[in-house]
Amino acid sequence: MADEQLDEKNLNSEEAGAVNGDARVQELEEQLAAAKDQSLRAAADLQNIRRRAEQDVEKAHKFALEKFAGDLLPIIDSLERGLELSNADDDTIKPMREGIELTLKMFHDTLKRYNLEALEPHGEPFNAEHHQAMAMQESADVEPNSVLKVFQKGYLLNGRLLRPAMVVVSKSPAPAQPSIDEKA
């Protein structure tokens, strides 16, 4: 009888151990799943950080010239204004004009090489993202909200606005006011 009780106790303790063992295995599996999930999240975070860092470096390379290019734009404007104001038919300044034209061409070629492009919106519809309206002018010749005149060219650096074009924008002509004679 004592042997039966001992066998029964051993059996009960083995069953209890098996139940405890199953619970322990389940607990360890849950911990393993949590650790795997945490590892995957950490790997994804690391990948996102690398991607963001690469994008930041790419942007830094693309737009490193932004300030320098912006400082060159007034020089280009002055050269262009000098050509506009000089008389092309005057033989005394012809060599100077040719020198300015060559210098300006070199500037434009260099700017193009570094993805700096001029915005010359004359005749185009007004675009608030790329143009700065300096004045409105009535015009029956063109569509309303079209660029009539460009005071200063705008520029894009790698597709991003560096300087807006300063423009005069057209508006519809005002309806004619009836004269005093027509009112009577």
From Swiss-Prot:
Cellular component, GO annotation: cytosol
Presence of keyword Phosphoprotein: no
Keyword vocabulary terms for this entry: Chaperone, Cytoplasm, Stress response
Short name of any one Pfam family annotated for the protein: GrpE
InterPro entries in UniProt: GrpE, GrpE_coiled_coil, GrpE_head
Region called Disordered, residue ranges: 1-24
Subcellular location(s) per record: Cytoplasm
BP terms from Gene Ontology: protein folding
Keyword Cytoplasm attached: yes
Record GO terms (molecular function): adenyl-nucleotide exchange factor activity; protein homodimerization activity; protein-folding chaperone binding; unfolded protein binding
Family: Belongs to the GrpE family.
Protein's job: Participates actively in the response to hyperosmotic and heat shock by preventing the aggregation of stress-denatured proteins, in association with DnaK and GrpE. It is the nucleotide exchange factor for DnaK and may function as a thermosensor. Unfolded proteins bind initially to DnaJ; upon interaction with the DnaJ-bound protein, DnaK hydrolyzes its bound ATP, resulting in the formation of a stable complex. GrpE releases ADP from DnaK; ATP binding to DnaK triggers the release of the substrate protein, thus completing the reaction cycle.
NCBIfam families membership: PRK14139.1, PRK14140.1, PRK14150.1, PRK14151.1
Subunit structure: Homodimer.
Entry-linked HAMAP family: GrpE (MF_01151)
UniProt name for this protein: Protein GrpE
Gene source species: Pseudomonas entomophila (strain L48)
Organism lineage string: Bacteria, Pseudomonadati, Pseudomonadota, Gammaproteobacteria, Pseudomonadales
